[in-house]
Amino acid sequence: MLEKKGVSPIGKHLDRIRTKTLEQALSKHPNIQGVKEAGGSPAKIAKIIERCGDDFFVWSGNDDEAVTAMALGAKGLISVLSNVRPKKALAMLRACQKNDFRTAGRLQRELIPLIGALFCEVNPIPVKAALDLLGFDVGTPRLPLCPMEPEHLARLRAALRSCLG
């Protein structure tokens, strides 16, 4: 019945917080230190940093935008990739912290196929599959989620091989 009205009965939902709300209320709250921004807009990250100041931390929530976000002033990344390739993800972030965006960009470009594979289905399905392929017994996704589609699993396997380390 809900589907007929255009509402998904099962899923993850995000509340978008307006930049003005962050600036005027949340960034000044003593118990709020920052925000994870995963809206897919580098312009929004820049606007939050500009309006809320350097004392209010912004973390990228998108692995494929980490370098761009950090070049704009984000403090780091809340990452899916780091669960699967922690050394490479850390090397990319450390390069950003050193303002070595040439190296950071190269590392991110190398990781793009894996990042794409990690997001080809709803999280956490691909990361659980990747960890399983790496030999970690993390179990299968809980219902209503299901195991990864075979063609996506093949893509993930190839992407993992392409960026060893």
Range-by-range predicted roles:
Residues R18-T19, N62, R85:
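Alpha-helix initiation/capping motif
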Residues T21, I48, D64-L72:
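Catalytic cores of alpha/beta
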Residues K4, P9, L22, W59, ...:
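Short, well-ordered helical secondary-structure segments
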Residues V67-G165:
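Structured C-terminal cap/extension of enzyme domains
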Residues S41, N62-D63, E149:
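Helix N-cap/beta->alpha junction signal
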Residues M1-F57:
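Glycine/proline-rich, positively charged
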Residues K36-E37, V58-G61, I78-V80:
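Short, conserved beta-strand edge motifs with alternating hydrophobic and charged residues
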Residues G39-G40, W59, I115-L118:
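Active-site glycine- and acidic-residue-rich loops that bind
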